[in-house]
């Protein structure tokens, strides 16, 4: 299990950007592979520190992590963190560029894919049985309709950055034989700046609003299923493609039924007389129909009755599971004097044939201890 990112960097959850940067620099210097050659534990720690800082230094990724933890980044969710070449080099050069140098070509700036979003939805077992179409409202970042996502005021366009001349990188001499190359501080590596920002989105190219979406929940869907809605995540930056929306489904526990795959289980109490003499009872299945279950005489507590085809539908398949009814024989309570007399009389006239399991059990137990004591 991954360690908490805040604990990895030894900072509080309220740490600001300056504290995060300071903590990262200290720990990265301590565990850098060049300072710990051959130390696999140090290398592993160094990767964990990098991943934690790459996530927490980005406001959007940090917000997603604070809300969902590591689950926000599983299978494409949220940040694209980890020990990858591009993300790590940007972080390391931004902080250690003045002492480490390097001439790595920055990956192309400009268009950026929008972040993936997560939406938690709880449905009932009945809704899982029938399927449903749900209307949800999702707060998200959408492309600004005023500037069409460019961030520039309508009628104007982003211009080439005068500091890096569109390269996104700047180079400076260290005073010796080497020079260092760093992300351009003016355009943040994009190669362009916005002189006249859009007034509606303040130059961001995106706006935050709540969107209404229709989600199809197919019949037979199981607890923990994830539904991906491609392109329904946050809008991309500067014309980049949108992210995806992931619906995480949970099924509310049912009062009467438990589910195991496509099968359903239900426990039904029956009276002692029904179990002894036989009888029947009715159960209402998930499809709303009444089904009568016959109880043969001498039924024991725990016996199961199988109702074929009365379980859950199999997702996107024609098959249907079964419903298993387990009876629990209820011992009478609060007996009247007459009821007690009748039971006492029944006890007197009963034989081992009426209770073969208990009679046989105690006989075997007696034989065991007699043999054991010899």
From Swiss-Prot:
Q: An example of a Gene Ontology BP annotation on this entry? A: chaperone cofactor-dependent protein refolding
Q: Which residues bind Zn(2+) 1?
A: 144, 147, 198, 201
List, alphabetically, the Pfam families matched. DnaJ (PF00226), DnaJ_C (PF01556), DnaJ_CXXCXGXG (PF00684)
User: Which residue numbers delimit the CR-type Zn fingers?
Assistant: 131-210
Residues at which Zn(2+) 2 binds: 161, 164, 184, 187
What keywords sit in the KW lines? Chaperone, Cytoplasm, DNA replication, Metal-binding, Repeat, Stress response, Zinc, Zinc-finger
Q: Which residues form a coiled coil?
A: none
Q: Name one GO molecular function term.
A: unfolded protein binding
Kindly list the places in or outside the cell where this protein is found, as annotated in its UniProt entry. Answer: Cytoplasm
Main location group = cytoplasm
Q: Name one GO cellular component term.
A: cytoplasm
Q: List residues of the J domain.
A: 4-69
Domain of life where this protein originates: Bacteria
* Cofactor(s) of this protein: Zn(2+)
Positions annotated as CXXCXGXG motif repeat: 144-151, 161-168, 184-191, 198-205
Co-factor remark: Binds 2 Zn(2+) ions per monomer.
Q: Which InterPro entries match?
A: DnaJ (IPR012724), DnaJ_C (IPR002939), DnaJ_domain (IPR001623), DnaJ_domain_CS (IPR018253), HSP40/DnaJ_pept-bd (IPR008971), HSP_DnaJ_Cys-rich_dom (IPR001305), HSP_DnaJ_Cys-rich_dom_sf (IPR036410), J_dom_sf (IPR036869)
Q: Which family does it belong to?
A: Belongs to the DnaJ family.
**What is this protein for, i.e. what is its function?**
Participates actively in the response to hyperosmotic and heat shock by preventing the aggregation of stress-denatured proteins and by disaggregating proteins, also in an autonomous, DnaK-independent fashion. Unfolded proteins bind initially to DnaJ; upon interaction with the DnaJ-bound protein, DnaK hydrolyzes its bound ATP, resulting in the formation of a stable complex. GrpE releases ADP from DnaK; ATP binding to DnaK triggers the release of the substrate protein, thus completing the reaction cycle.
> Subunit structure, per the record?
Homodimer.
Comment field on protein domains: The J domain is necessary and sufficient to stimulate DnaK ATPase activity. Zinc center 1 plays an important role in the autonomous, DnaK-independent chaperone activity of DnaJ. Zinc center 2 is essential for interaction with DnaK and for DnaJ activity.
**Stated name of the protein:** Chaperone protein DnaJ
